[in-house]
């Protein structure tokens, strides 16, 4: 463990990371690839908590835009994250990684309810914990969930795994070829520059609790391991 920079991490995975090229739904071969990457890091002795998004299933904001009540639309999105969490748990356990799912909305037949002390105990015992159903409340993103859970668990860093984007830019690099990549930023830089990395609530929570953020490209094999070993890839956000 002497060559590991981060001992306890929170990995934020988008729902799209589990969908692969198809963009929607659950893609088992793609999830298995993600699980194998996570296993590499787990085998180093790193304690790993995961927050999964649900954008491959549903987005609450999109539901609200077509006339649904926003709270109801958000609850549907939370259920989507539970499906993703169960699929990821299955893949992780298939490669020999003990995994627990905890949900912010109780559904005891399929997962444990979120209990902070129990989650920490799982991590200490070498189990991965996947947090699903967001915060359990509408209007809060899974990015905010990641910042909240990282704060509660005393995680050292949030690993923000992105699809095909290798860090934070001053413009969308997929649209603007002149977009400039940042290698280091502070949390206030994120807020003041209006950089769309995570929402303001999540950024403020991370800043107030002194949690670093590393944004990197999930599509490059081995990147999660590189980050926890301290290799400077992507963009690191830390300090006020």
Swiss-Prot record:
It is found in: Cytoplasm. Pathway: Pyrimidine metabolism; CTP biosynthesis via de novo pathway; UDP from UMP (UMPK route): step 1/1. The keyword Plastid does not apply. It catalyses: UMP + ATP = UDP + ADP. It holds the Pfam family AA_kinase. Gene3D superfamilies: Acetylglutamate kinase-like. Keywords: Allosteric enzyme, ATP-binding, Cytoplasm, Kinase, Nucleotide-binding, Pyrimidine biosynthesis, Transferase. Its EC number is 2.7.4.22. It is an enzyme of class 2 (transferase). The keyword Signal does not apply. ATP binds at residues 12-15, 55, 59, 163, 169, 172. InterPro entries: AceGlu_kinase-like_sf (IPR036393), Asp/Glu/Uridylate_kinase (IPR001048), Uridylate_kinase (IPR011817), Uridylate_kinase_bac (IPR015963). Allosterically activated by GTP. Inhibited by UTP. GO terms for molecular function: ATP binding; UMP kinase activity. UMP binds at residues 54, 74, 135-142. HAMAP family: PyrH_B. Homohexamer. Belongs to the UMP kinase family. Catalyzes the reversible phosphorylation of UMP to UDP. This is Uridylate kinase. The lineage of its organism: Bacteria, Bacillati, Bacillota, Bacilli, Lactobacillales.
């Amino acid at each position: 463990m002497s060559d590991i920079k981060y001992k306890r991490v929170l990995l934020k995975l988008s729902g799209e990371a589990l969908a692969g090229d198809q963009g929607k739904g659950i893609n088992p071969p793609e999830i298995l690839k993600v699980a194998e990457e996570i296993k590499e890091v787990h085998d180093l002795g790193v304690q790993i908590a995961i927050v999964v998004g649900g954008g491959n299933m549903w987005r609450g904001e999109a539901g609200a835009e077509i006339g649904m009540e926003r709270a109801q639309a958000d609850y549907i999105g939370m259920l989507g994250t539970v499906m993703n969490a169960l699929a990821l748990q299955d893949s992780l356990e298939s490669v020999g990684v003990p995994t627990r799912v905890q949900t912010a909305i109780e559904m005891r037949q399929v997962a444990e309810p979120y209990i902070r002390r129990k989650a920490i105990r799982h991590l200490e015992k070498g189990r991965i914990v996947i947090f699903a159903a967001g915060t359990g409340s509408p209007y809060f993103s899974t990015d905010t969930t990641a910042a909240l859970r990282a704060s509660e668990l005393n995680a050292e860093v949030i690993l923000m795994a992105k699809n095909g984007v290798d860090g934070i830019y001053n413009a969308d690099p997929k649209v603007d070829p002149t977009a400039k990549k940042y290698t280091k930023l502070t949390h206030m830089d994120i807020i003041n520059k209006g950089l769309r990395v995570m929402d303001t609530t999540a950024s403020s929570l991370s800043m107030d609790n002194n949690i670093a953020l590393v944004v990197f490209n999930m599509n490059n094999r081995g990147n999660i391991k590189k980050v926890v070993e301290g290799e400077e890839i992507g963009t690191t956000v830390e300090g006020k």
